[in-house]
């Protein structure tokens, strides 16, 4: 039964990703570029590392684990070690990087929003991508969210990432950046919703 469930979920995931790729071709090309770069870095036995837009250093910790089984009279205990001296887990480095990079962008947006809210004397709280303030300040928070978002994404983030990697991994030749889309970020400031 477990085999059938794995097969079915893999099939559904593949179909979903294919449809998403058709609907959001630019995003798919960017995700593919991120994965290709991660594959290149991992092929040299290096963990994928980068700086978030606010300067936080990020290193993916995925390494092959080493298991030890301890047999006792009461039970068998399996201990797993994933120390820094172990080789990287290449597949996890590749598959985890695109979403991890996006999370670093999201967290940068959250931090920059919190700083701007504080600068304006407004309360702010957040969990993951859910942002809160007092009901009387929601309209102002929506303005701040959009201003910070457009300021962040007006930066050439992929170019910055590639330049950083070219310095960090000088022996690697990274593929050309994906083509930029046509979204006018200024429209986000006036849209009722971020995505329509």
Please report, for each region that a protein language model flagged, where it lies by residue.
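Conserved catalytic core of nucleotide polymerization and phosphodiester-bond processing enzymes
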Residues: 1-196
